[in-house]
UniProtKB/Swiss-Prot annotation:
Pfam families attached to this UniProt entry: Ribosomal_S16
Organism: Syntrophotalea carbinolica (strain DSM 2380 / NBRC 103641 / GraBd1)
PROSITE patterns for this protein: RIBOSOMAL_S16
One GO CC term on file: cytoplasm
An example Gene Ontology biological process: translation
Keyword annotations of the record: Ribonucleoprotein, Ribosomal protein
Similarity comment text for this entry: Belongs to the bacterial ribosomal protein bS16 family.
Coiled-coil regions, chain positions: none
Name of the protein in question: Small ribosomal subunit protein bS16
InterPro entries per UniProt: Ribosomal_bS16, Ribosomal_bS16_CS, Ribosomal_bS16_dom_sf
Source organism superkingdom: Bacteria
GO molecular function per UniProt: structural constituent of ribosome
C-alpha cells in the first residue's frame, strides 16, 4: 500500500476548494482517505493554506509521498524544510 499526501477537491463548479489528505494511491481523488491534514483555498488572495504541521511531519516520516502540488504548499509553509532537517 503506497500512501500519498494529496489534494481532494471540493467546492462548487468553478469555485474549487481543496483538502490536504493522506490517502492510498489506489483510492479516487475525491474518495476515501486516511486522515485530513489541512485545507487549501486558491481563490483567496493570497491563497489560504492551513496545515496540521505535527501530523504532516508524522506522515512524512512514516514514508508518505507528497504530490508535486502538495510539496510546493509544504515548502511555502516551511514544513518541507523541517522534514529535511530531521
Amino acid at each position: 500500500m503506497s500512501v500519498k499526501i494529496r489534494l481532494a477537491r471540493g467546492g462548487a463548479k468553478k469555485k474549487p476548494f481543496y483538502q490536504v489528505v493522506v490517502a492510498d494511491e489506489r483510492f479516487p481523488r475525491d474518495g476515501r482517505f486516511i486522515e485530513q491534514l489541512g485545507q487549501y483555498d486558491p481563490r483567496q488572495n493570497p491563497s489560504m493554506v492551513t496545515l496540521k504541521e505535527d501530523k504532516t511531519l508524522e506522515w512524512l516520516n512514516k514514508g508518505a509521498q507528497p504530490t508535486d502540488t502538495v510539496r510546493r504548499l509544504l515548502r511555502t509553509q516551511g514544513v518541507w524544510a523541517k522534514f529535511k532537517q530531521a
